[in-house]
């Protein structure tokens, strides 16, 4: 199959089975760059100079559903984290209201499917980091009522009740309150997202959950040994759980040679006063200056396909998906430059012999199914369980984690 033929097949497949992407940081990029002023950054226009995402490129990429991250910095704690998360939610709702012919809010699997049938991109929300609930199950429920349909248990730092993959162990997984968070998420129908969490947290969550979990943007640790990726024993546990691991495109998570380069680049950014996750024009300019002096190892669509090949082998075709992390990273793989690029990845997988039925599961069906399954579990649990009023002090004590 020629590259051109594969790309044509990929586009045709995505017209029938569009991508549901697990993680896009457009709301935070809009906060950082224009203070949520959508007049200053109109995504109905070409925003390629500033963003990975705009409406035309979402359409070109065959995106039918997007989990918009309502991420806030881990430095935000308590009330500040909660209010900033609500501001992020408000941004997603404002985008849907401003572009109703393109974006449609979706809170359920049925609403996701209905949005696609109406020719719109289903817009769902995921909160990225347990700091967004400020150790409060009532706040967790409030975020659910506002439309949040997954919670990533941690971001890059630990929370008092769960360990992150990129922080020093403190709880050795989940505390008793962390288990209660997972169980209350199950009762609500909010997906438990295990991207960013430590392997012991992954394993504790899989033991605690009554519903399928997701990894909204994580790849294979066996292919690239970065702590943000998923160990094989956890991937192998997904069929029994029913969960879905959504492979990410972040170069330092998919290409071993990019790990050390990224560490050095982040150190240079820190010296100049930038946060490692800063994607403002000033931070990007500093990064590009470093890249000019120290050439960057370049991932490609084939690099990501290597991860998906391995994840399919270990977890099975019913338990994988895609979570690009666009607008949350400074660099993307060659050929996966922005949200218009999903056809390039699908074309690469077609050339490797993936069937159209398998690709339809990867792009669309697995994500719809995991959301629908979580909703079914919640309906059953709500017949017998009341909202939890447990507190972290009651379950973990005044001295913190177990």
Where are the predicted features?
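Histidine-centered catalytic micro-motifs
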Residues: 19-26, 197, 215-219
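Distinct, well-ordered alpha-helical segments
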Residues: 136-140, 201-211
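N-terminal hydrophobic targeting/anchoring segments and the immediately downstream early-domain regions
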Residues: 1-172, 225-402
């Amino acid at each position: 199959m020629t590259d051109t033929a594969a790309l044509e097949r990929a586009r045709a497949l995505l017209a029938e089975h569009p991508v549901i992407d697990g993680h896009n940081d457009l709301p935070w990029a809009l906060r950082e760059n224009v203070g949520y002023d959508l007049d200053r950054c109109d995504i109905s226009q070409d925003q390629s100079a500033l963003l990975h995402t705009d409406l035309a490129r979402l359409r070109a990429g065959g995106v039918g559903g997007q989990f918009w991250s309502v991420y806030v910095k881990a430095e935000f704690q308590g009330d500040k984290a909660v209010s900033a998360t609500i501001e992020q939610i408000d941004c997603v709702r404002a985008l849907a209201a401003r572009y109703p012919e393109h974006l449609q809010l979706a809170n359920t699997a049925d609403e996701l499917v209905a949005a696609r049938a109406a020719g719109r991109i289903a817009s769902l929300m995921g909160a990225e980091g347990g700091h967004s609930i400020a150790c409060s199950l009532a706040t967790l429920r409030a975020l659910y009522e506002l439309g949040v349909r997954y919670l990533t248990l941690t971001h890059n730092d630990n929370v008092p009740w769960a360990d992150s993959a990129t922080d020093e162990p403190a709880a050795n997984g989940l505390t008793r309150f962390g288990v209660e968070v997972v169980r209350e998420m199950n009762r609500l129908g909010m997906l438990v997202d295990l991207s960013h969490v430590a392997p012991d947290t992954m394993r504790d969550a899989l033991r605690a959950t009554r519903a399928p979990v997701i990894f909204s943007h994580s790849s294979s640790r066996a292919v690239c040994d970065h702590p943000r990726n998923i160990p094989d024993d956890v991937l192998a546990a997904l069929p029994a759980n029913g969960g879905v691991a959504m492979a990410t495109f972040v170069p330092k998570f998919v290409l071993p040679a990019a790990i050390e380069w990224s560490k050095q680049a982040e150190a240079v950014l820190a010296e100049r006063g930038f946060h490692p996750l800063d994607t403002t024009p000033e931070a990007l300019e500093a990064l590009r200056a470093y890249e000019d002096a120290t050439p960057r190892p370049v991932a490609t669509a084939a690099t990501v396909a290597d991860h998906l090949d391995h994840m399919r082998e270990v977890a099975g075709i019913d338990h994988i998906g895609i979570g690009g992390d666009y607008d949350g990273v400074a660099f993307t793989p060659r050929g996966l430059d922005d949200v218009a690029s999903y056809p390039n990845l699908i074309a690469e997988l077609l050339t490797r012999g993936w069937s159209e039925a398998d690709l339809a599961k990867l792009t669309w069906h697995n994500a719809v199914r995991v959301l629908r399954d979580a909703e079914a579990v919640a309906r059953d649990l709500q017949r017998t369980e009341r909202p939890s009023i447990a507190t972290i002090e009651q379950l973990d004590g005044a001295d913190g984690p177990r």
